[in-house]
Amino acid sequence: MPIKIPDQLPAAEVLGQENIFVMTESRAVTQNIRPLRVLILNLMPKKIETEIQLMRMLSNSPLQVDVDLLRIDDRESKNTPQAHLENFYHDFEQVRGNNYDGMIITGAPLGLVEFEEVVYWPRIVEIIEWSHQHVTSTLFLCWAVQAALKALYGMEKQTHGEKLSGVYRHHRLDEHEPLLRGFDDEFVAPHSRYAAFDGDLIRAHTDLQIFAESAEAGVYLAATKDCRQVFVTGHPEYDALTLDGEYQRDLAAGLEPVIPVNYYPDNDPTRTPRASWRSHGHLLFSNWLNYYVYQLTSYRVEDIGKVFTYQQNSPSR
């Protein structure tokens, strides 16, 4: 089934050229089924690039998905046309009263910035709290995992001495976890972060279930027991050339970045990298949509908040 997006969104043309099943709003109104409503809080600088990457992941599912885009920083963007933001993005006040089957909060280039110094940190905390009553399941990516661990569990950020960048091997820890259904026992995924996610610390300070880990990159995939918060510390949505773009950008800025590990053929940045994580990336998003969103959400989207209020107030809990 397709992902439903606005008719003029740039991602529609790009994904169509890639033979990915998308449905414009004008066509979707003829469909007589309820699509899943997913809110994407896009914190990445290159918003159009991130939109395309995430919508590519969401489209590979038998479920129809209706996407809303959210921004919380109203400062002028250096990487995204203002007209694009005005045409396709909502601010939080516009969606505050809505319910969503799923929400994705992206990463952000803020790994070395203290939370309190992030201009929109109070709003991030507010949205995470808001999601408890308005979203069935939230997927946090990379920096958003750090933010959620702080907001939900009071965990302070841990950082690496140098940026963790490259494609790392992970092993699954649970053979029966639906999020990993169809995964190989070992799989690779890209990372691009200063954040450190130590399994022992996360186990000591949270009640999260850890489903996949890496000897080099730490925890990769975890979730709350009720499936309502999912934490992915890497970037399974990345294109084959995204890490290369980041490396070349940092190189041009004189930052002397480390070469992303296990990424370039023969570790040679002049050679074109290929994506080795694409199938598992698609599978992760598909499993999340199916098992953590579709299977758990309310039949009527307007009932989502009522269901979770009832569950929280139930004497059996």
From Swiss-Prot:
Offer one example of a GO biological process linked to this entry.
L-methionine biosynthetic process from homoserine via O-succinyl-L-homoserine and cystathionine
What is catalysed by this protein?
A: L-homoserine + succinyl-CoA = O-succinyl-L-homoserine + CoA
Hey, where's the site called Important for substrate specificity on this chain? S192
Known role: Transfers a succinyl group from succinyl-CoA to L-homoserine, forming succinyl-L-homoserine.
Gene source species? Aeromonas hydrophila subsp. hydrophila (strain ATCC 7966 / DSM 30187 / BCRC 13018 / CCUG 14551 / JCM 1027 / KCTC 2358 / NCIMB 9240 / NCTC 8049)
Which positions are catalytic residues? C142, H235, E237
Q: Which superkingdom?
A: Bacteria
Q: What is this protein called?
A: Homoserine O-succinyltransferase
Protein family: Belongs to the MetA family.
Location of site Important for acyl-CoA specificity? Answer: G111
Looking at the keywords, is Acyltransferase present? yes
Lineage, broadest ranks? Bacteria, Pseudomonadati, Pseudomonadota, Gammaproteobacteria, Aeromonadales
